[in-house]
Amino acid sequence: MELLTFRDVAIEFSPEEWKCLDPAQQNLYRDVMLENYRNLVSLAVYSYYNQGILPEQGIQDSFKKATLGRYGSCGLENICLWKNWESIGEGEGQKECYNLCSQYLTTSHNKHLTVKGDKEYRIFQKKPQFLSAAPTEPCIPMNKYQHKFLKSVFCNKNQINFNHDSNISKHHSTHFLENYYNCNECEKVFYQSSKLIFPENIHIQKKPYNSNECGETSDPFSKLTQHQRIYIGESSQRCNKKCIIVFSQSHLKGHKIINTGEKSVKYKERGKAFTRGLHLGHQKIHTGEKPYKCKKCDKAFNKSSHLAQHQRIHTGEKPFKCKECGKAFNRGSYLTQHQRIHTGERAFKCEECGKAFNRGSYLTQHQRIHTGEKPFRCKECGKAFNRSSYVTQHQRMHTGEKPFKCKECGKAFNRASHLTQHQRIHTGEKHFKCKECGKAFNRGSHLTRHQRIHTGEKSFKCEECGKAFIWGSHLTQHQRVHTGEKFFKCKECGKAFTRSSHLTQHQRIHTGEKPFKCKECGKAFNRRSTLTQHQIIHTR
């Protein structure tokens, strides 16, 4: 059994797992790792202090300056964790860097801390000083160097000196506890995860700090304020999971998001598993709890990060900008999706037909074509759809809602696509051109129909009589001949028709409207076909 390394207590995420965390969870991860690292540093420094190597003030200074960050000269793929003193007489120089899944973190770069050693201040003499202005070198991968954080060469329990840290590592393994460590001074219980324990002699008599809440004595270098945070708001705040550290109050509410006690925790409500611990935010899905409320519109959310994203709608803030075209977004995920337009990347591939998509949601929608799944149902008529947007569009038929209005003529539509198509009438825009004859259309569907004239294709066949049509609407109209269905009824006289166009023509009898006018003689008609017949007179 070896001494503790940072990797023993670190939580590592795969790229896929990291993408599942929202910014608040990523920040919490960083804070937890920082506190774990500081605990390790404090234990290492205390080992030296207990041997009389460091004075008390030096320990306090060292702990305050212990920090976690990236090398200044490293890329975003490395996080820096500084190994303790290398050997007796080591001069000022750079410590090793651990490559620890930080390619997914967003912490700012920090200067590397070095240990200054010279003739006056050797490692095992009086006071090594942490400096924060030293330049840095490229990081060294974790798998190349496996340095220990605890570099004690003196065992307090047996009063034995060791010349090499590996020897004392083997020796110390005999003193480690396997599960829980109880402090006899304050009865605080620490869980020993991956051999992380807190020594009892933390309650030293040299200038102790006392907590006003519980009277517990803390060591001078571990910060009284950290100890006191446990008692803020409640007499005791503890995680009932097996955590490496006791979190500050700001972490207590959400620290279960990353619980390091188990590698996989299964959620009983739906059997969902979280590889790095039980996600507290997931529980809110089942409880319906939404503690984060927007002050502008009173909309509530179960995550603070979701509230932060929502508030950008009110402020208009769009902090995520595309470097290619300059387009800005209020969410990082939207920017990621947008950038795939420039790169042409289609990371989401259908296993059934091989079709690829640039968004996971598009793939999910597409897969319903293969499965036949239609999870979105209309509450009015029970009709089911494979997309939620289709239900929304369909429901407007029942409500009569037409939210999309033309600014030119005021005509309203129940679909945005219908408005777009309509606006081309005003602009004269005809994007869709036939390659055979050059005729252009303002709708893609119209071009598709037109092309069947050239190909002779009649895809829509009547099952009753076998008659085929080039347009689906023509087949629908034809089928009413067999069924006798007449949906379109005149409100004036009650006469019914199989086609809406026939009803429109009929209504002109009641209104007297004659929109079709002859250019030769000015005579007007209520039907186009009647005008066509009339124009033959002028051509004779």
Curated annotation (Swiss-Prot):
Presence of the UniProt keyword RNA-binding in the record: no
Domain of life the protein comes from: Eukaryota
Subcellular location: Nucleus
Protein name listed in UniProt: Zinc finger protein 519
GO molecular function: DNA-binding transcription factor activity, RNA polymerase II-specific; RNA polymerase II cis-regulatory region sequence-specific DNA binding; zinc ion binding
Chain ranges of zinc fingers (C2H2-type): 181-203, 292-314, 320-342, 348-370, 376-398, 404-426, 432-454, 460-482, 488-510, 516-538
Pfam families (alphabetical): KRAB, zf-C2H2
Signal peptide (from-to): none
InterPro entries: Ikaros_C2H2-ZF, KRAB, KRAB_dom_sf, Znf_C2H2_sf, Znf_C2H2_type
Family matches, as SMART domains: KRAB (SM00349), ZnF_C2H2 (SM00355)
Family statement: Belongs to the krueppel C2H2-type zinc-finger protein family.
Assigned keywords, A-Z: DNA-binding, Metal-binding, Nucleus, Repeat, Transcription, Transcription regulation, Zinc, Zinc-finger
Keyword Cell cycle listed: no
Limits of the KRAB domain: 4-78
GO CC annotations, alphabetized: nucleus
Protein task: May be involved in transcriptional regulation.
One GO BP: regulation of DNA-templated transcription
